[in-house]
Regions:
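Mid-domain catalytic core of redox enzymes
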Residues: 230, 258-368
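A conserved FAD-binding loop/helix module that cradles the flavin
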Residues: 467-489
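N-terminal glycine-rich phosphate/pyrophosphate-binding loop and immediately adjacent elements
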Residues: 3-143
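Active-site/ligand-binding neighborhood in enzyme catalytic cores
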Residues: 129-249, 437-445
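A conserved beta-strand/loop element that lines the FAD pocket in flavoprotein oxidoreductases
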Residues: 246-259
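C-terminal segments that line or cap access tunnels to active or ligand-binding sites in enzymes
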Residues: 319-426
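A glycine-rich dinucleotide-binding beta-alpha-beta segment and adjacent secondary-structure elements
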Residues: 192-207, 413-472
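Active-site-proximal substrate-binding core of FAD-dependent oxidoreductases
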Residues: 491-502
Length: 502
C-alpha cells in the first residue's frame, strides 16, 4: 500500500485509466473533472432530454486479446460490447466504399470501387495491412515513445528478437508518409483512392495522405476492419466503468470541480492544487484536461496546429428512416466527401462530413421508441469563428448546418424526418469544456515518429495524458497514455522516495 498521492486533472479515458492503475497499486488518487459527467471525448451530455455522445461512438481494441480489452482485463473490468461487421460507408463524389470486416468482401469492395486500378489498390492495401500488423505488435509491447528510461521500452527488446523481419520493415517505413507508399504502387495521382484515404485519415490522424505518417496511419486505416464495437449503453459506459473501478479501489472522483491553480512547491517537492471542491498537495499530477495551467503543464500551450469541430446533434423520426437503416446494425456511420454545391462547408470546414446514426436514449440511457439519434462533425479551423461579428457568426453557422443536412440528404432522407437539430462550433466547445481544439495533433512524421510527445512533461512529477500517445489518436491511445503515465509515476516516485532518504 503506497502513501503517495496523485491528482488527475480531467476524467477523460486517459486520466481515468491512469487513476485506475494507480489506485489498484494502492496510490491515493483524486480525479478532478470540470464537467458533470466522466469520459471526456468518450462521455456524454444532455440536450432536449436526450443523451448525446460527446465524441466517439464506436470503440476499437475490444476484440479478444485486443489492446483496450487487455487493459480492462488487467483492471478487472468487464465491459460488454457487440462487434460491428459493417460499421461504415464512405461516400465519394463518384461512388461508395463499404468498410466491412470480412476479408473476401473487403477485397471485392476494393475491386468494385477502384475497378480501373483494382490490382494496384489491392496490393497497396495488402502492404498497408502488413505494416498495420507490425505497428500493432510493437504497440502491444507497451513501448512508450519517446524512450527516455529503460522501462519505457516495455517488452520491445523481446518482441524485436522474436520478430526481426517485422521490426526491420517498420524501420524501413518509419519516415514514410501514406503518399510515399502510394507512390510505390503508382497510385499517388489516382484521385478516387486519394479521396477515400483523405476522408479516413483526416478523421483518424488529423491530416491527409501528403503529411500523414505511414506507421500510425496504417493502423488508423485498418482498425475499423480489425474490430469495431458498440458498447452496451454507449461509449460513455467506458468512462463509467473506469470511474466505478477507481471508487471501488478507494479513489476519489470530484465532478464539477474545475482547477483554478496548479503550483509546484519546490521545498516539499509537491504540487499544490486548488479547485472548486479540492485544495490539497499531491506527490504527482496527471493533466488529462488538454488545458494549460502554466508553462510545461499541457501540450496546448505549444505552437502546434490543432483542429476544431463543427458539430450538429439531431433527433430524427425512425419511421421515415426505416428503409435505409433496416439492414444496418446501429451505430452506423457515413463519411461523406462534400459536393461542390456546399460553398459554406468548403469555406469554413475541411474534409468529410462524419455522421453517425444511433439509438436515441433519454437521460437515464433508456431507448426512446420511434426516434433515431444523429451526430455530425466536420473539421474546422479554430480561429475563423472568433473573427465573425455576432450576426455573421449566427448566419454562417445556420448556413453550414443547412448545407451539412443537404449533404447527408444525398445519402439518407433526414430533412423530412428531423425532429430537432442543434449546431455547435469551437466556441461552443470552449464554453462547455474549456478548450476549442479536439482530436489531438496531426500525426505527421515529426509528431508521430521523430518528435513524439511524451507522457512526461518538462515539469517535475507532472505527466500529460491524452491522444498524443503512439499510435494515436483516439480512445485507444488515450487509454494507453494513461497506462504509460501510471507506470512512470510508480517508477519515478519510488526513485524519488529513495533520493529523499539520503
Amino acid at each position: 500500500m503506497s502513501s503517495k498521492t496523485v491528482c488527475i486533472i480531467g476524467a477523460g479515458v486517459g486520466g481515468l485509466t491512469s487513476a485506475a492503475y494507480l489506485a489498484k497499486e494502492g496510490y491515493k488518487v483524486t480525479v478532478l473533472e470540470k464537467a458533470t459527467t466522466v469520459g471526456g471525448s468518450a462521455g456524454w451530455y444532455i440536450r432536449k432530454r436526450r443523451k448525446f455522445p460527446t465524441g466517439a461512438t464506436i470503440a476499437f481494441g475490444l476484440e479478444e486479446k485486443g489492446l483496450l480489452r487487455t487493459l480492462l482485463n488487467e483492471l478487472d473490468i468487464d465491459l460488454p460490447a457487440e462487434e460491428l461487421l459493417h460499421p461504415m460507408d464512405v461516400i465519394l463524389p463518384e461512388g461508395k466504399v463499404s468498410i466491412v470486416k470480412n476479408p473476401a468482401l473487403w477485397e471485392h469492395e476494393l475491386k468494385e470501387a477502384f475497378h480501373p486500378r483494382s490490382g494496384d489498390v489491392v496490393r497497396f492495401w495488402a502492404t498497408l495491412q502488413q505494416i498495420s500488423d507490425d505497428v500493432l505488435g510493437v504497440t502491444e509491447s507497451r513501448v512508450s515513445l519517446p524512450i527516455r528510461k529503460r522501462y519505457d521500452l516495455g517488452t520491445l527488446p523481446r518482441h524485436a528478437v522474436r520478430n526481426p523481419k517485422s521490426v526491420a520493415r517498420l524501420a524501413r517505413y518509419a519516415l514514410y508518409t501514406v503518399e510515399d507508399l502510394m507512390k510505390k504502387f503508382h497510385l499517388e495521382s489516382y484521385e478516387p483512392l486519394r479521396q477515400l484515404l483523405d476522408a479516413q485519415l483526416l478523421d483518424a490522424v488529423q491530416t491527409d495522405v501528403s503529411k500523414a505518417a505511414l506507421l500510425p496511419s496504417s493502423l488508423a486505416l485498418t482498425i475499423y476492419r480489425r474490430g469495431s464495437f458498440f458498447i452496451e449503453n454507449g461509449m460513455g459506459q467506458l468512462g463509467k466503468v473506469l470511474a466505478n473501478r477507481i471508487k471501488d479501489l478507494g479513489g476519489e472522483i470530484l465532478k464539477v470541480s474545475p482547477v483554478d491553480s496548479l503550483l509546484y512547491e519546490e521545498t516539499r517537492k509537491q504540487w499544490s492544487v486548488t479547485s472548486r471542491k479540492c485544495t490539497s498537495s499531491f506527490d504527482a499530477v496527471i493533466n488529462n484536461s488538454g488545458i494549460s495551467f502554466g508553462e510545461g503543464t499541457s501540450y496546448e500551450s505549444e505552437d502546434e496546429f490543432s483542429w476544431g469541430a463543427f458539430r450538429v446533434d439531431a433527433i430524427l423520426s425512425a419511421e421515415g428512416l426505416s428503409r435505409q437503416l433496416k439492414e444496418r446494425r446501429l451505430p452506423f456511420a457515413y463519411q461523406i466527401v462534400p459536393s461542390l454545391d456546399s460553398p459554406s462547408i468548403r469555406e469554413t470546414t475541411h474534409g468529410p462530413v462524419y455522421v453517425t446514426f444511433n439509438h436515441a436514449v433519454n437521460p437515464k440511457g433508456e431507448p426512446v421508441e420511434g426516434e433515431v439519434m444523429m451526430t455530425v462533425s466536420l473539421h474546422t479551423e479554430l480561429g475563423i469563428w472568433s473573427r465573425y461579428t455576432e450576426d455573421e457568426y449566427k448566419r454562417i453557422k445556420e448556413q453550414v448546418t443547412k448545407e451539412t443536412l443537404s449533404e447527408i440528404e444525398r445519402v439518407i432522407p433526414v430533412k423530412e424526418n428531423l425532429l430537432f437539430a442543434e449546431a455547435g462550433t469551437p466556441l461552443t466547445y470552449e464554453r462547455y469544456i474549456g478548450k476549442r481544439a479536439v482530436g489531438g495533433f496531426p500525426l505527421t512524421v515529426r509528431n508521430a515518429i521523430t518528435k513524439p510527445k511524451s507522457v512526461r512533461s518538462s515539469q517535475p512529477q507532472l505527466y500529460i495524458v491524452g491522444e498524443q500517445a503512439f499510435p494515436g489518436p483516439g480512445t485507444l491511445s488515450s487509454a494507453l497514455s494513461g497506462y504509460y503515465a501510471a507506470r512512470s509515476i510508480m517508477k519515478d516516485l519510488k526513485r524519488l522516495s529513495k533520493w529523499k532518504r539520503y
